[in-house]
Design a protein with these regions (language model features):
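Extended, subdomain-level signal for the structured scaffold at the beginning of enzyme domains
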Residues: 1-96, 104-108, 124-126, 133-136, ...
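Structural detector of well-ordered beta-strand residues that form the stable sheet scaffold
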Residues: 96-97, 118, 135, 150
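A conserved active-site-flanking secondary-structure segment within enzyme catalytic domains
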Residues: 112-142
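A short glycine-threonine-serine/GTX helix/turn-capping micro-motif
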Residues: 146-154
Length: 241
């Protein structure tokens, strides 16, 4: 089984590292980190770099695709090479998954039109703008009851998503063994990990932390252009109807 994890500049590291640690332990599995070309890709920290092992052209038929999120989402969601690859490989995949704002990329590729999806709380409104039905109260959302598109909420939810996929692919016993092997038994010392639980002050602080990355020139410009693209798409859709 081949698992392709999409990398791009300014991805969030935990979005893919958590799922990678789970999925790489499935039997007979090859994990690829894919981008336009092999080589280092810099995370949103500006310090951490991860090596893309394969290009999109070298990965024409993955069984599982996972798209992480991060401040670079708005830029990659306008990258036609990435979107075309997602559309091309989709029919042959067993699972098409995203973590955090990676669901915005799936939506930009047209894979979430009219479907249920989740994401980081800060971009749920963007999913609606892009034709999906946002779900903010679930960690893992299956787009259709029997479908193969799975989206996870923000950042740490990627581990839950990967554990779910491990159960679907390798069976419950294997998934439980992986869970114990990585000692995934979350017991956070604070209970503010969802908007429904956080205080107003915590929400304000978290929003400010996000803003440090999102107001940088490139993500900000790309976000505006992405919103423009979707507005034009809706207008053209109404005219052709």
């Amino acid at each position: 089984m081949q698992i392709a994890i999409v990398l791009y500049p300014s991805f969030t590291a935990l979005d893919f590292i958590g799922p990678y640690e789970v999925l790489r332990n499935l039997p007979d599995t090859e994990v690829r980190f894919v981008w336009h070309e092999p080589g280092p890709v810099t995370a949103d920290s500006g310090v951490l770099m991860v090596g893309a092992t394969h290009s999109f052209d070298e990965t024409p038929s993955p069984d599982v695709v996972l798209v992480p999120g991060g401040p670079g989402t708005t830029m990659v969601a306008r990258d036609e090479k990435v979107l075309d690859w997602l559309r091309q490989v989709y029919p042959g995949t067993t699972w098409m998954a995203s973590v955090c704002s990676g669901s915005v990329v799936l939506a930009a590729a047209g894979l979430l039109d009219g479907k249920r999806a989740t994401s980081h709380w800060s971009v749920l409104s963007a999913l609606k703008l892009m034709g999906a039905t946002p779900v903010g109260d679930q960690r893992i959302v299956r787009a259709d009851p029997d479908g193969k598109v799975i989206t996870a909420a923000g950042v740490s939810a990627g581990i839950d998503l990967a554990m779910w996929l491990a159960g679907q692919i390798g069976g419950e016993a294997k998934a439980k063994a992986i869970q114990l092997m990585i000692e995934y038994d979350p017991q956070p010392p604070f209970d503010s990990g969802h908007m429904s639980k956080a205080s107003a002050a915590t929400k304000a602080s978290a929003t400010a932390l996000l803003g440090k990355d999102m107001i940088k020139p490139e993500p900000l410009k790309a976000g505006v252009l992405l919103a423009w693209d979707q507005a034009v798409r809706r207008v053209r859709g109404r005219r052709s109807a």
